[in-house]
């Protein structure tokens, strides 16, 4: 169950980061109006900030895991991602949206390497190739499913629904991680 949850978490991170793709230019254009070139530049900057902060967090997550248990970091990062998606929606201007998008990228950058580490520790050596093949495939599927789902959701319920539904999914995952960790702790106590 832990490995499946970590694979789902990787799918979700890719789903969430790319899911906003179809609506971000339209959402920003609605916020600021203006010409398409300015909107395209701002969207590019926001995507760059989110990706850059995610990469920087991934590079330094080992320092954090040296001081805090991995499950606590995952719980915190998932919950914070949920809050940050709500804050992105609530921002009155593109710079606030960009700031919270970059923070979201930072917390997602903590999730991916930690979930990979947990998978590595939980899977027997002879099954790692298969498990990481599945993990990569599902993570890449998140890159496709995110924009499809978000586009359909935005078309039916408006742009805000994309932010709220993604936040809800992160809160749900936070709960799943907590419950899974509790089960593991209880099983270890019985052993």
Each model region followed by its residue ranges:
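Interfacial helix-cap and linker-helix signal at transmembrane-aqueous boundaries
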Residues: 28-29, 64-65, 152-158
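Helix-to-loop junctions at the C-terminal end of transmembrane segments
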Residues: 56-69, 154
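Structural signature of the two symmetry-related core transmembrane helices
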Residues: 72-87, 164-167
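A membrane-interface helix-boundary motif in multi-pass transporters
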Residues: 152-170
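Short amphipathic helix-loop junctions that connect adjacent transmembrane helices
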Residues: 22-41
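Paired small-residue
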Residues: 84, 95-104
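Pair of pore-lining "gating" transmembrane helices in MFS-fold secondary transporters
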Residues: 2-20, 102
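Intracellular juxtamembrane helix-capping segments at the cytosolic ends
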Residues: 110-123
